[in-house]
Amino acid sequence: MFPSRLLEKWWLRAFIALVIFFVWQLFYAINRVQSLEEERATLQATIEVLTRKSDGLRTQIFEKERNLVRLNGKVEEIDTQIRDHLSLLPRVNRSTPFIYFITPTHFRAAQRADLTRLSYTLSHVPNLHWIVVEDSDELTPSIAGILKRSKIPNTHLNARTPSDQKMRYDDPNWTLPRGVEQRNRALLWIQNQLSGVKEGVVYFGDDDNTYDLKIFGEMRKVKNAGVWPVGIVGGMFVETPILEKNGSISHFNAVWKPERPFPIDMAAFAVNISLVLSNANALFSFDVPRGYQESTFLENLGIHRYNMEPLAEMCTKVYVWHTRTEKPKLSKESIDRLTKKTGFNSLEAHALGVDN
């Protein structure tokens, strides 16, 4: 009877219920904590497993990247070997006339760059002999290095322009004739060293002009003296001979000194080597009027308009452009160093080709 009385008291029943609730919550919390600890341990174990796998994958990736670097190095080595072997293959086709490509060159900021670019063009041309003539008292190791690396059959010469005929850095290109001594040095070399040659073509190619490989095929067609259009020259998009219906030359479209016997650029013609060998006095001169270097040379070879051969699909295509590398804008101090060829740091010297 006593317990029933106690239970009849509502507050006692509520207290007992509350105690039971808190006890249940305590057991639940303890179980939950134990469960979380187990989950944490499981998760930590999983993380450790994944970390080990990640380390393993990272090691594999590193090994594969290292192998890739090795393979890339091997590919480059093989490419180099292939290029070297190809360069050593015979470049001479006896049925194809040789081109004697004469390039006068002088020291300037872009000389090394221009000759490097030109060497890559000429390296694609078989049966070509590159005659490079420096405007200097001695041969430059930098230019010799370009010629050696090009694997092009070549002759390296030098001829100094007289001081009274040399232009200052800021002089316009047309102030004085350029390449006179250098072209003559090359012509004399041809006359002395190639006197027994029966076939071949002589061409004067500036080191900063642009050449389509097709122009070399046109040169090989020359029987006497060939002529073709030249782009970006003489204040025009194209300078070209104008032909009659029968294919002979009527006149030229030049606007600068059109009265010249041959109002064309040096890049516009090539001559058979037999003409050079049989006309030893056909040389260039400082004593001709400005713009008459080409005309005087061709006339001294006995060339006339009527016996020139229009090439490049009867002068309807342009395969050579008289491009010019722009002079860099330099300070007076830099121009002075360039003129004296001194005072360069090692990187500048390498860029300019004075690092020997």
From Swiss-Prot:
| Catalysed reaction equations from the record | 3-O-(beta-D-galactosyl-(1->3)-beta-D-galactosyl-(1->4)-beta-D-xylosyl)-L-seryl-[protein] + UDP-alpha-D-glucuronate = 3-O-(beta-D-GlcA-(1->3)-beta-D-Gal-(1->3)-beta-D-Gal-(1->4)-beta-D-Xyl)-L-seryl-[protein] + UDP + H(+)
Q: What happens when the gene is disrupted?
A: F1 adults accumulate eggs in the uterus. Embryos are predominantly arrested at the bean/comma embryonic stage.
Instruction: Tell me how this protein sits in the membrane.
Output: Single-pass type II membrane protein
Q: So which stretches are on the Cytoplasmic side?
A: 1-9
Drop me one GO molecular function for this one. galactosylgalactosylxylosylprotein 3-beta-glucuronosyltransferase activity
Tell me the InterPro entries matching this sequence: Glyco_trans_43, Nucleotide-diphossugar_trans
Glyco sites are at: N93, N173, N246, N272
Q: Where does Mn(2+) bind?
A: D208
The protein's name in its UniProt record: Galactosylgalactosylxylosylprotein 3-beta-glucuronosyltransferase sqv-8
Question: Which gene does this sequence derive from?
Answer: sqv-8
